[in-house]
């Protein structure tokens, strides 16, 4: 009997209302234009990185293999939330179906968790390349790289299935307003008709622990790298420092959000939306900028690719 009641309660809410970004009508045009530009540039920048890495054989190395994965993830991660947000800018009632909300949460956490694992793998790749250069091609051979890629995508999928499963099993029978511009687990579970304290602890121990542990591993990895480079100022070492600085910047931007949102109970703070905007719209745009501006090989390969296209057009 209790299960039947719970099923009926769960089926009462078929749509959620997204509160979105609270702005007046005059600001909507500016906000829409800004995020549309961000999204288009994110697509162009990251797709261009993937094409360049595929096209230029000099970039067929483990580091750029993982970088192409990062660019692909950034495109997908941004696409999960930004197009819906752009449509909702002009909608007075921002609705999302229960199924669409669950789907959005699944892919959001799939790409986010996969990126966390990927950034950790990239830190290990840089550690081996800089601290053990003679063993690099043995340790980071292509078989290992492919296995690592499969492992991090599998880990992201398992994590996302676990969180989504916890969310959809809860009964939703009344409140339907999500205080955000997309569906995310912390905001959705607050709408459940039962006490979610245990679920919140599980989320913190899952997402929060993954974020904190990976961040610590990353910081330790780069600390070891910096210690090994501190007394060497050759051109190759300066290049290595530049690459590590780019990686560390991306790590700080991305994991900072994850730790802020998922390492505490599901309480709304005024800063949550600002952090979420930065996480979903700004960080995927900054990644290609950071990697290309600080990477001479990428800039050279991009110039070569653009130059060849221009010559073809002239012919």
Swiss-Prot record:
Predominant localisation class: membrane
GO cellular component terms listed in the entry, alphabetical order: membrane; plasma membrane
Residue numbers on the Extracellular membrane side: 1-33, 83-101, 165-208, 262-272
CDD domains: 7tmA_OR4E-like
Pfam hit, one: 7tm_4
Location in the cell: Cell membrane
Top-level lineage group: Eukaryota
Glycosites: 8
Intrachain S-S bonds: 101-183
SMART domains from the UniProt entry: 7TM_GPCR_Srsx (SM01381)
Annotated coiled-coil segments of the chain: none
The keyword Disulfide bond is assigned to this record: yes
Keyword field: Cell membrane, Disulfide bond, G-protein coupled receptor, Glycoprotein, Membrane, Olfaction, Receptor, Sensory transduction, Transducer, Transmembrane, Transmembrane helix
Protein's GO biological process: detection of chemical stimulus involved in sensory perception of smell
One Gene Ontology MF term: olfactory receptor activity
Cytoplasmic side: 55-61, 123-143, 230-240, 294-315
Record family assignment: Belongs to the G-protein coupled receptor 1 family.
Descriptive protein name: Olfactory receptor 4E1
Lineage: Eukaryota, Metazoa, Chordata, Craniata, Vertebrata
This protein's encoding gene: OR4E1
